[in-house]
Regions:
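Conserved beta-strand scaffold positions in the cores of enzyme catalytic domains, especially
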Residues: 11, 147, 176, 240-242
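Short alpha-helix boundary/capping segments
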Residues: 59-65, 118-122, 267-274
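Short glycine-rich anion-binding loops that position phosphate/pyrophosphate groups of nucleotides
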Residues: 42-46, 182, 248
Length: 289
């Protein structure tokens, strides 16, 4: 928030939903109700138990296999713990109980355990790109652009859901471009539902992303929302657009594999500059309409 104030913005913490025990703290700069373009990123940090969160947006069979492998690994660990306790106590009941609670503990640790100290791509990169975009906007474009930093994305996009519930017009009508894991990889996947694609604001965003791609050393791939696997805050908005970066891997296709581990230490400055320039250009095009 201090950085936003240095740039002349007036950020504030959006009103928390007192009925929600997680007490989301979404940070907002600008006027989302009257803006033509919303740009967002999540600022909460994922918990980690050392298992990578493989993001595979376009290869559904491999995506399912990767998720199944994680679950199988957790089941095996839980079974080993349960078996050890069962053998030590010579109790089948304790074996079953220990297995169940060990699996439950692993699930909870994945969501609410120790925060990952290495989060360069997820999602420091998204925040950095958003802040750089804020810096580049002209005074006129600032009037038509708003920014939201969502809380609790890692626990099921709860912050974005809460914000949408309290601001229904924004949730249903406004184009929102969400930057998540945009630092590691040179291929950008942009996912947008039909309602977003029909908006002139989306046309400006897409045009700017395509215009700046080659000079920035990146490529872009555009899909409908149904054509991309994975969660994200943008899915909580009717006209939400997801933007993420990926690598190409033989036999898998697009993939990002370091997040939620100690190896999440990579962010290409070229990616941040590319997104900031493209989104600033798009905002200026909207202002010139």
């Amino acid at each position: 928030m201090a950085k936003m104030r240095e740039m002349g913005y007036r950020p504030y913490v959006d009103g928390m939903n007192r009925k929600d025990k997680l007490r989301h703290r979404n940070i907002v700069a600008g006027d989302p109700q009257n803006a033509e373009l919303l740009i967002s990123a999540h600022y909460d940090t994922a918990a980690t138990i050392g298992i990578p969160d493989l993001r595979i947006p376009r290869n559904f069979p491999v995506y399912i296999l990767s998720q199944g492998a994680v679950l199988l690994g957790m089941l095996l660990i839980s079974l080993l713990i349960g078996t050890a306790v069962g053998l030590a106590t010579k109790s089948g009941d304790l074996l079953i109980l220990t297995f169940f609670f060990a699996y439950l503990a692993l699930m909870l640790l994945m969501m609410f355990g120790a925060a990952n100290k290495h989060n360069v791509n997820d999602n420091t990169s998204g925040i950095a790109a958003l802040l750089e975009t804020m810096q580049r906007l002209s005074p006129e474009a600032r009037e038509k652009t708003a920014f939201i930093l969502f809380d609790h994305q890692e626990t099921g996009s709860r912050g974005a859901k809460s914000y949408g519930a309290q601001h229904v017009e924004v949730q249903t009508m406004k184009l929102l471009v969400d930057l998540n894991c945009v630092g590691d990889g040179d291929t950008f996947v942009i996912s947008a539902p039909k309602m977003a694609q029909d908006k002139p604001e989306y046309a400006a965003v897409r045009e700017s992303l395509e215009e700046n791609a080659m000079a920035s050393g990146v490529s872009t791939q555009f899909f409908g929302r149904a054509g991309v696997q994975g969660a994200g805050d943008y899915r909580r908005f009717v006209c939400g657009v997801g933007v993420s970066a990926y690598h190409h891997s033989a036999g898998v296709g697009l993939i990002t594999g370091r997040i939620h581990t100690s190896r999440d230490t990579v962010c290409r400055q070229e990616n941040l500059d590319y997104l900031a320039k493209s989104l600033a250009d798009a905002a200026q095009k909207m202002n010139d309409l």
